[in-house]
């Protein structure tokens, strides 16, 4: 039975789809049967998964490693179809549109085991307040959810960003993941090829970030213990 993870935020432009797809691709590469449910009407995740690398590039990877389906037209009605698919996968990641313009995120949270809120760490005071509100509302939608965690996304280097993250870490009402997702060209490059960063290079900074994020998320979901089993089964 799949564990269900919802990636959401009140706004757009914070790396929700990038997070959902890179995380899904990384977990799929580890042997987890993974489905991405694209709830955004723009269909970015679905389009991403249909792109095939140019054969002239001679890449080993020929396509995105996780399954992607769009349930965007269903809106709040996506709950039952997703629940019906749960027995077929190890992990289902729901990529949602901005919550300010859609009820889909709140519907997805009702069947989720865990939620991630990617955010761009710029204005600490503004984000801290919004982070608390989003986390509380998510818990209201599903009191049984294992956790609602914030993921620093599109992170740039610098003392200002470090200061913002330090403020978040000291806030007892905000659950901040240890992992971060930096603003790196590798993420966009892999998207343009219809792949995830781990398929291009397992040693790149981006691939290492996604590996760390996968470790953290799988542990929170209670799936990490099966990593060794999954890998052993693929030998």
Regions found by a protein language model. Give the residues of each.
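Short, hydrophobic alpha-helical segments
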Residues: 214-225
